[in-house]
């Protein structure tokens, strides 16, 4: 009933489309039952297999992958980089300000203006402070990079969101965006870390491929029909793609999430 009400609302408002992303399985099923289109894609997630610490996690990886991660972490340490992290209301205004510098720099380096402004993050800090975890990389006490992680404490899930650096340090991106968050997840009993869309390279850090589903409704019948045909072909390929990725598992026994 809710899905049909949404469609009627979209039609009444002359909207061209409706989209539901990152939905719960029951909501996806309700939309499918109502005839909406489903799109299957792949993301890369890390799963906590009751690891005691980061070393225990590394022992779950193939020897080559363990060696690579240790080398990358050593490069950051030898560059004089140290990390600190803050959560919730412990994130100071100065930390938020520095983070925004990093966030802005990332976009400007790619020739784009940042699509979120400083006030947006200030509101997040006020309205939902406990959902944020900030890592700050420092050299000699001076901040040089940061990464912002979103948290869902009830489900034990962390989401890699934004990162940026004011200077280039070899392997700093991997440390700030993967190894520090994973170490934190292990220490705090979080069960999953989602590193965002795309990126088969994330498998080298034990983020494993997971099928995700989004829901779509298009108002124009001919356009909807064309998209539906495309999605049918795309879905056929997703299964094969997941099988190929599973063969490249970095885990010692090839087990997936």
Language model: regions and residue ranges:
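In a subset of proteins, long, contiguous C-terminal domains/tails are tracked
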Residues: 219, 224-257
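A structural signal for short secondary-structure junctions
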Residues: 127-130, 141-142, 150-155, 172, ...
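Feature representing long, continuous alpha-helical segments
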Residues: 97, 101, 158, 175-183, ...
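Conserved GNAT acetyl-CoA-binding A-motif
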Residues: 13-21, 185-197
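A conserved beta-strand-loop-helix scaffold within acyl/acetyltransferase catalytic domains
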Residues: 3-171, 216-217, 232, 249-257
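C-terminal structured "cap/appendage" subdomains that terminate the fold
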Residues: 189-194, 198-233
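Conserved acyl-donor/pantetheine-binding loop and adjacent beta-alpha core of acyl/acetyltransferases
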Residues: 1, 157, 222-225
